[in-house]
């Protein structure tokens, strides 16, 4: 994959990535569309729901790793579908076995099936256990700055606050909480859930997020591969805008042309 690595590259758990767009692998019509969309996104980290996706646990079924090989992508197993800390920890341990000792994992412990909001009590409990077990934990959480800091202090490798409910496409609903999380953090902050279109991804990056993870926004689009390409450009543009620094907002106009030396 031709992904430019610069001094501004994303670093997670000691590994450097040229792309700040992380993608999911669910909801695509088939494995070929998954492959094409992942390539169009330029993603280097792809997340996989261990309880829903075959990565070797079912030998007779199509294997996602045949189209997204671990030699090319960092596979990020996640605990989607888990509602208790115990289930999440068990799922991570299974993933580590299937991926030959791979320790990077995405933790999510959900509160209920309607909202898919994280159960923060169970999330904290699972995060503490997984860190003790030697996992590098990227954790899905609410946009609560206090909780985000606590997860960082536990030892999580990245904190992943939601922008809006999973799959909602509502975009960033509370940018001020995200800003506080970003300002206080010493680990990467990656927006996870709620992105609907390219402008949402760009806004997240303009705020100073280190990356964006998405699945439904790409897989649910009319043309997923084209949307993946759009998201790639949005993340890159948003990051460059953040680094460049936006102009201050003003209530009144400010002429862009100099007034000195006017003719007449």
From Swiss-Prot:
SUPFAM superfamilies assigned? ThiG-like
Q: Where in the cell is it found?
A: Cytoplasm
Coarse class of the primary localization is cytoplasm
Keyword Cytoplasm in the entry? The reply is yes
The positions flagged as active site in the entry are: 106 (schiff-base intermediate with dxp)
GO function terms (MF aspect): thiazole synthase activity
Query: Which Gene Ontology BP terms does the record give?
Result: thiamine diphosphate biosynthetic process
As recorded in UniProt, its EC number(s) are 2.8.1.10
Sites binding 1-deoxy-D-xylulose 5-phosphate sit at: 167, 193-194, 215-216
What pathway is it annotated to? Cofactor biosynthesis; thiamine diphosphate biosynthesis
Q: Which InterPro entries match?
A: Aldolase_TIM (IPR013785), Thiazole_synthase_ThiG (IPR033983), ThiG (IPR008867)
The reply on keyword ATP-binding is: no
Keyword annotations: Cytoplasm, Schiff base, Thiamine biosynthesis, Transferase
Q: Which reaction does it catalyse?
A: [ThiS sulfur-carrier protein]-C-terminal-Gly-aminoethanethioate + 2-iminoacetate + 1-deoxy-D-xylulose 5-phosphate = [ThiS sulfur-carrier protein]-C-terminal Gly-Gly + 2-[(2R,5Z)-2-carboxy-4-methylthiazol-5(2H)-ylidene]ethyl phosphate + 2 H2O + H(+)
Q: Where are the transmembrane segments?
A: none
Q: Which GO terms describe its cellular component?
A: cytoplasm
Q: Give the family this protein belongs to, as stated in its UniProt record.
A: Belongs to the ThiG family.
Instruction: Describe the task this protein carries out.
Output: Catalyzes the rearrangement of 1-deoxy-D-xylulose 5-phosphate (DXP) to produce the thiazole phosphate moiety of thiamine. Sulfur is provided by the thiocarboxylate moiety of the carrier protein ThiS. In vitro, sulfur can be provided by H(2)S.
Q: Which PANTHER family match?
A: THIAZOLE SYNTHASE
* Subunit (UniProt): Homotetramer. Forms heterodimers with either ThiH or ThiS.
HAMAP family (alphabetical) = ThiG (MF_00443)
Q: What is this protein called?
A: Thiazole synthase
Native organism is: Stenotrophomonas maltophilia (strain K279a)
Q: What is the lineage of its organism?
A: Bacteria, Pseudomonadati, Pseudomonadota, Gammaproteobacteria, Lysobacterales
Q: Which gene encodes it?
A: thiG
């Amino acid at each position: 994959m031709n992904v430019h690595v610069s001094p501004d590259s994303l670093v997670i758990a000691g590994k450097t990535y040229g792309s700040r767009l992380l993608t999911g692998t669910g909801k695509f019509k088939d494995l070929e569309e998954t492959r094409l969309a992942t390539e169009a996104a330029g993603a280097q980290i792809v997340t996989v729901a261990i309880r829903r996706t075959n990565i070797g646990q079912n030998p007779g079924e199509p294997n996602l790793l045949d189209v997204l090989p671990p030699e090319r992508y960092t596979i990020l197993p996640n605990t989607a579908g888990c509602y208790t800390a115990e289930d999440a920890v068990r799922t991570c341990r299974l993933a580590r076995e299937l991926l030959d000792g791979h320790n990077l994992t995405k933790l999510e412990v959900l509160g209920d099936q309607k909202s898919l909001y994280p159960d923060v009590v169970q999330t904290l409990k699972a995060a503490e256990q997984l860190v003790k077990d030697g996992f590098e934990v990227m954790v899905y959480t609410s946009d609560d700055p206090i909780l985000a800091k606590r997860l960082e202090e536990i030892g999580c490798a990245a904190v992943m606050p939601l922008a809006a409910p999973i799959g909602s496409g509502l975009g960033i609903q509370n940018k001020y909480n995200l800003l506080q999380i970003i300002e206080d953090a010493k680990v990467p902050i990656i927006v996870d859930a709620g992105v609907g279109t390219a402008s949402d991804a760009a806004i997240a990056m303009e705020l100073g997020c280190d990356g964006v993870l998405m699945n439904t926004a790409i897989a649910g689009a009319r043309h997923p591969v084209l949307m993946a390409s759009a998201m790639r450009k949005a993340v890159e543009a948003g990051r460059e805008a953040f680094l460049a620094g936006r102009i201050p907002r003003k209530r009144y106009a400010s002429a862009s042309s100099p007034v000195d030396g006017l003719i007449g």
